[in-house]
Swiss-Prot record:
Catalysed conversion reaction: a ubiquinone + n Na(+)(in) + NADH + H(+) = a ubiquinol + n Na(+)(out) + NAD(+)
Top EC class of this enzyme: translocase
Gene that this polypeptide is encoded by: nqrB
InterPro entries (UniProt xref): NqrB (IPR010966), NqrB/RnfD (IPR004338)
Organism expressing this protein natively: Haemophilus influenzae (strain ATCC 51907 / DSM 11121 / KW20 / Rd)
Name this protein carries in UniProt: Na(+)-translocating NADH-quinone reductase subunit B
Main function: NQR complex catalyzes the reduction of ubiquinone-1 to ubiquinol by two successive reactions, coupled with the transport of Na(+) ions from the cytoplasm to the periplasm. NqrA to NqrE are probably involved in the second step, the conversion of ubisemiquinone to ubiquinol.
Membrane topology: Multi-pass membrane protein
GO molecular function: FMN binding; oxidoreductase activity, acting on NAD(P)H, quinone or similar compound as acceptor
Family to which this protein belongs: Belongs to the NqrB/RnfD family.
GO CC terms: plasma membrane
Localization terms from the record: Cell inner membrane
Length: 411
């Protein structure tokens, strides 16, 4: 008996009236993960499209692969030189299970480490965070699905991977579990679940950690996976001394724009490489999963605001001098613009609203980065702020359209 036949034989017990009917969401999630659902349309429909929600989420997940793999490589690429500068590898192996595992696997952690060793070390930091986040999120999704009696939505795959990509590699696992719990329950499930959340769950979870546990999510010691090493992000360096202050934390060499574009600098695991993000972004824009109007609006808002600050200038705030092309490649701007701001649930759905929504994100991101002295990164808060205004933009656009059509009809 094949596996599919086994599922079909078990299915009646999970259907309404069956012995395990309350557990149908769990059965359905496993079955549809392995096989295409047999449900088909029997009547006329307005839209016929092979891209259902499952395939859409899988496409977004796959589009993140360039950022995932480069992020893992960069964790090792930043950590290994720092380790050799500190010279405390034996102490780390004794006190940090990440390096104990790396040592047991025979990874080369010397200055001559290969890209494979760097990638493997990065995976040792990234995969546990992702597995914890995925497991906790799955438990909550299954629990709410069983209680409410609806199917498990595949959006959890995207929420979990995005959350894992926007946190530091050194984040404690229990905080990762707590952050995604907040994002799933408070930002999504209490408002009705999938399709009803007005904020991005991954960003809401990270914002919770930022305000609740700032020492583990920000500062100078969390971005390089080497205990005892302190290295500020490029945004922090610029905020202290302008472009001339940008330098690699280990070698002291200047950070070029190409270094930032490719991602050769410390930061959150999925945010460092603008190049990798744009490769994945091209996929979701081409497949029309991401709205290009939102991305264009973010760029327009960012360019206009940064140019305005450049013209105003400041003798005391170096961030006024940051041009738009540096804003584009530093911090979480690219990842937020391409994969976070374009979330179809929490973003505006009208075409005109998408322009205003995107522009607000671009303006607020630069405004927070430039004017706020306590927090050099502004993309996370800018997107969450714009999420609150997305329904307002749509309401204004819809009402304006109603008035226009009414005037045309009456005229």
């Amino acid at each position: 008996m094949g596996l599919k036949n086994l599922f079909e034989k078990m299915e009646p017990a999970f259907l309404p009236g069956g012995k395990y009917s309350k557990l149908y969401p769990i059965f359905e999630s496993i079955y549809t993960l392995l096989y295409t659902p047999g449900t088909v349309t029997h009547k006329n429909t307005h839209v016929r499209d092979a891209l259902d929600s499952k395939r859409m989420m899988i496409t977004v997940f796959l589009a993140l692969f360039p950022a995932i793999f480069y992020g893992m490589y960069n964790v090792g690429n930043q950590a290994i030189p720092a380790l050799n500068q500190l010279g405390n590898l034996d102490q780390l192996i004794a006190n940090d299970w990440h390096y104990a595992l790396a040592s047991s696997l025979g990874l080369d952690l010397t200055a001559n480490a290969t890209w494979g060793s760097k990638m493997a070390l990065g995976a040792i930091f990234f995969l546990p965070i992702y597995l914890v986040v995925f497991t906790v999120c799955t438990i909550w999704e299954l629990l709410f699905s069983v209680v409410r009696g609806h199917e498990v939505n595949e959006g959890m795959f995207v929420s979990t991977i995005l959350f894992a990509l926007i946190v530091p590699p050194t984040l404690p696992l229990w905080q990762a579990a707590l952050g995604i719990t907040f994002g799933i329950i408070v930002a999504k499930e209490i408002f009705g679940g999938v399709g009803r959340n007005f904020m991005n769950p991954a960003l809401a979870g990270r914002a919770f950690l930022f305000f609740a546990y700032p020492a583990q999510i920000s500062g100078d010691t969390v971005w390089t996976a080497a205990d005892g090493f302190s290295g500020a992000t490029a945004l922090s360096q610029w905020s202290q001394g302008g472009q001339g202050a940008l330098q690699h934390t280990v070698t002291g060499a200047p950070i070029t724009w190409m270094d930032a574009f490719v991602g050769n600098l410390p930061g959150s695991m999925g945010e460092v490489s603008t190049l990798a993000i744009l490769i994945g972004g091209a996929v979701i824009v081409f497949t029309r999963i991401a709205a290009w109007r939102i991305i264009a609006g973010v760029m327009i808002g960012m360019i206009a605001t940064s140019t305005l600050f450049n013209l105003i200038g400041s003798e005391t705030n170096p961030m006024f001098s940051m041009p738009w092309h540096w804003h584009f490649v530093l911090g979480g701007f690219a990842l937020g613009m391409v994969f976070m701001a374009t979330d179809p649930v929490s973003a505006s759905f009208t075409n005109t609203g998408k322009w205003w929504y995107g522009a607000l994100i671009g303006v607020m991101a630069v405004l927070i980065r430039t004017v706020n002295p306590a927090y050099p990164e502004g993309m996370m808060l800018a997107i969450l702020f714009a999420n609150l205004f997305a329904p307002i933009f749509d309401y204004i656009v819809v009402q304006a359209n109603i008035k226009r059509r009414r005037a045309r009809t009456n005229g």
